[in-house]
UniProtKB/Swiss-Prot annotation:
GO MF annotation, one: flavin adenine dinucleotide binding
Organism of origin: Methanosarcina acetivorans (strain ATCC 35395 / DSM 2834 / JCM 12185 / C2A)
Matches recorded under InterPro entries: DGGGPL_reductase, FAD/NAD-bd_sf, Geranylgeranyl_Rdtase_fam, Geranylgeranyl_reductase, GGR_cat
Lineage: Archaea, Methanobacteriati, Methanobacteriota, Stenosarchaea group, Methanomicrobia
Segments crossing the lipid bilayer: none
Protein name stated in the entry: Digeranylgeranylglycerophospholipid reductase
Note describing how the cofactor binds: Binds 1 FAD per subunit.
Length: 407
């Protein structure tokens, strides 16, 4: 490990690895570090991802594909089923990944591009001089290092310390985080071509239950509950999950379990300071509805890698420059989608089960294969006029999208 690099990336998840790869491909000297001894482990993710969006960033390798899905099925509290084709099911439906292999592959891509990759290496603090981030203090195998870099990219996940060290407010209120529990089960009787989502205040208050098939009778089965609806004197996510699994898969065996939190807050006020950018869950760039963050993280990582090159090449790594080449760009793309999802989330978390049943009933006969956003919203909210008003901004956005496609 050297003392000086162009770019130091802290965290080797999808956001960090894509940022490191992109910067290295531009000819920058990049160090990518990961605090764990194995990249991609433990997995804290349902592992679903949209095919076409994924192909924007990587060439598909079957070694990290567990299942190729046709679509998704959503079940309302009374069991009403809404089925959607994969193309319009959202960012988490398409492929089911083996994240342990996938994340390592992304880090390998960064290494092949020229980045230096170090595992079991954690940041213990930032080097800040004259109000500029100049690098970080690292710990590797019990030895301390001081590594300087022209730009630091914080990709250290939902529990990010890098942002706090830099003075960025990344705090989350209970309502802004989904507390999650997930089992990998074997011996499950499950349709291998569809993922399933179950909603309702009895089954997952403020969240949902998911099932992602992984082939050969295996599946990720998990639940996310809003943080303000669990805790002391309230059932825990694992309690909801156990209840669901016992009823749905009485003969299945649990072979792995993971627990964690997912930010569903929407984007934070700023994701950069002098000499530093935040990406992925560290920047709260996950989808506020689903909690899914792989694709948003990869998008932001790519933008950050390109921004690092532009800023360093210009000799200007100030906040003003990073706002121009990173902040502005990701907010106009990924950030816009996050803002729209947050509007939907804030409306839906207050719906009663009978409202959810009514909405599902209005959609159960809809042919989703060819439906556009505007058509979907029209059908969805015939059953709930108040919700239609609360989400009126989405209709305006959908109308703009229709007009843009016509020009």
């Amino acid at each position: 490990m050297k003392d000086i690099y162009d770019v130091l990336v802290i965290g080797a998840g999808p956001a960090g690895s894509i940022a490191a790869k992109t910067a290295a491909e531009k000819g920058l000297d990049v160090l990518l570090i990961e605090k764990r001894q194995e990249i991609g482990d433990p997995v804290r993710c349902a592992e679903g991802v949209n095919k076409e969006y994924l192909k924007k960033h990587v060439e598909i390798d079957n070694s990290w594909i567990c299942a190729d899905l046709k679509g998704s099925r959503i079940y309302s509290p009374n069991g009403t089923k809404v089925e959607m084709a994969e193309e319009i099911s959202g960012g988490e439906v398409g492929y089911v990944l083996e994240r342990k292999i996938f994340d390592r592959a992304l880090a390998e891509h960064a290494a092949k591009a020229g980045a230096e990759v170090r595992v079991k290496t954690r940041a213990t603090g930032l080097i800040i001089e004259d109000d500029f981030v100049k690098g970080a203090r690292l710990m590797n195998l019990g030895k301390e290092y001081e590594v300087r870099a022209k730009i630091v990219i914080g990709a250290d996940g939902v529990e990010s310390k890098v942002g706090r060290w830099a003075g960025i407010d990344t705090s989350l209120k209970p309502i802004d985080i989904e507390t999650c529990a997930q089992y990998l089960i074997a011996g499950a009787d499950i349709d291998p071509e569809y993922c399933e989502f179950y909603i309702g205040n009895e089954i997952a208050p403020g969240g949902y239950v998911w099932i992602f098939p992984k082939g050969e009778g295996k599946a990720n089965v998990g639940v996310g509950i809003l943080g303000n609806r669990t805790g002391k004197f309230k059932p825990r996510p694992v309690d909801y999950l156990n209840n669901f699994v016992e009823k749905k898969f009485p003969n299945a065996k649990i072979v792995e379990m993971v627990f964690g939190g997912v930010p569903v807050s929407g984007s934070i006020e700023k994701t950069s300071v002098n000499g530093l950018m935040l990406v992925g869950d560290a920047a709260r760039q996950s989808d506020p509805i689903t909690g899914g963050g792989i694709l948003n993280a990869m998008d932001a990582g790519k933008i950050a890698g390109e921004a690092a090159y532009e800023a360093i090449s210009s000799g200007d790594v100030s906040l003003e420059k990073l706002e121009e080449v990173y902040e502005k760009r990701w907010r106009e793309t990924t950030g816009h989608d996050i803002d729209m999802s947050l509007i939907v989330k804030n409306c839906f978390i207050n719906l009663k089960d009978e409202d959810l049943d009514s909405l599902a009933d209005s959609l159960k006969e809809v042919k989703f294969e060819s439906m556009r956003l505007f058509d979907l919203l029209q059908a969805l909210f015939k059953a709930n006029k108040k919700l239609l008003w609360d989400l009126r901004v989405l209709f305006k956005d959908a109308a703009k999208e229709v007009m843009k496609n016509r020009t």
